């Protein structure tokens, strides 16, 4: 092979330039065989014993994964310099030889800043973040001055504010320029990840120069800290300062508009995407689909998706998630199947969305998706397992859900919350309490407000008054969670179910914040059941004051007024309902026939074959009537 190369170049003995080009091309190929051939040629030319060519050949072996050959060559290099040791250290880390790398670092006769940076980045790449930080502190004890690369690595792995402050202080003491975008962007993003918004903002304000990455980090910091309106303000300020946004910027802004249900501003951001040519980016398009969906414009989401020339997993996930958000399980499943026919491979987000969209009449389809989950190896993923359990609980298949629970390792808090709530809603209160007790024994997880809501629901459905009151009373003291509207509503419903209506009203009257109408609903229903129209009227009026656009208190008051012959008040309320365009909630049912799901609402004929069905019922009624006449005769 190399004889041909020599002839092509007209060379009898290759030059240093020839070998330099050859090594560079061989590094791109990553071929172990080619690495050996190049090494042999260097030996033949007498170059390999020089430190420079030994180092280059060492790089070649490590790049091709030939670690044994690399270590043999390392031992053969007579005059090793710091670069030789650094190349070997980096190569060992890159190929996963962690213990060898640690031993080599200890043996190094001299370490420069590159050696320390390689050690830190190597430990980080192997997942040993804490050790990486310790090495940084050791580096300081050896009085090695860190570089901007050191700080950017460290900022990406810090997990506590104290360490973050130390690294920030070291960057200042090391004289890092305020114009250094790499370091200060990394420090700002570090504070964002740690949830210290004020610190991230202070870094941004002290920077002498800012680029689009700086602004992106600021916008994301505002959004993550819950200041989404402020995040949008920063985006428009960025535009005023003529900083050109990138695709990541606009995707963030569209997502923020989605969370705020700001349709008009979201449309402006999408218009900017069109102007800047960002609509070819899947993440931007996915954010747009999600934004329209959450702003109750599902038709626009579908329209945007249908205009796509090519599908990928990000876009399909967004559309399936939109269908799931609007409880369109059939459409989500149909798109899921169609995406696979278009060679779009589902991922964990796809499965989570499509499983979450399935309703109580889609058990057979859910079982099919579960089989595919197992086949593709996603059954071990906690998020997918959570969605599987949620689907089975919704369809009433508690045993199948608990089978998923038993087989899943690495359960997170969302997983535990799902099983507690699922058991509660399927009238398995005793099992729900048992799972809750298992969670309490887990040292790494602590119940949150969702967990406690689930266990209160279990007590409510089962009528466990003592257990419910005990859990509710200990929320703040034992678990550090202040009861919210949903917790008060649940404990009040529990008391009302067992006839303790006065105790329930006492709790409602002592709520330390403005209660929602959901808190008063159980008391209202219980007072109606007991025939206490005076209390029912008082509660209904209270609900009407807090939520004037809810139809339920209107209907209750109308019923009370008609029962007590107060027709004038009843007419006034009916007029007010019409004026506010309020309607009573419609009951609905669903039925699955083969591969289709049909939805039926009360007083609605706009269903599949609705008028034909009613005509057939009329004929059957007449036929039945004729039969009765015939038999009576």
From Swiss-Prot:
PPR repeat residue numbers? 50-80, 81-111, 112-146, 147-178, 180-210, 211-245, 246-280, 281-311, 312-346, 347-380, 381-411, 412-447, 448-483, 484-514
Give the residue spans that cross the bilayer. none
Which Pfam family, just one, is annotated for this protein? PPR
Superkingdom classification of source: Eukaryota
Q: Which UniProt keywords apply?
A: Mitochondrion, Repeat, Transit peptide
Q: Where is the transit peptide?
A: 1-30
Where are the residues of the annotated region Type E motif? 519-594
InterPro entries, A to Z: Pentatricopeptide_rpt, PPR_At4g14850-like_plant, TPR-like_helical_dom_sf
Q: Which Gene Ontology cellular component terms are annotated?
A: mitochondrion
Q: Provide a Gene Ontology MF annotation, just one.
A: RNA binding
Q: Name one GO biological process term.
A: RNA modification
Coarsely, its chief localization is mitochondrion
Where would you find this protein in the cell?
Mitochondrion
NCBIfam families (alphabetical) = PPR
The similarity comment for this entry is: Belongs to the PPR family. PCMP-E subfamily.
Protein known as: Pentatricopeptide repeat-containing protein At1g43980, mitochondrial
What gene is it encoded by?
A: PCMP-E58
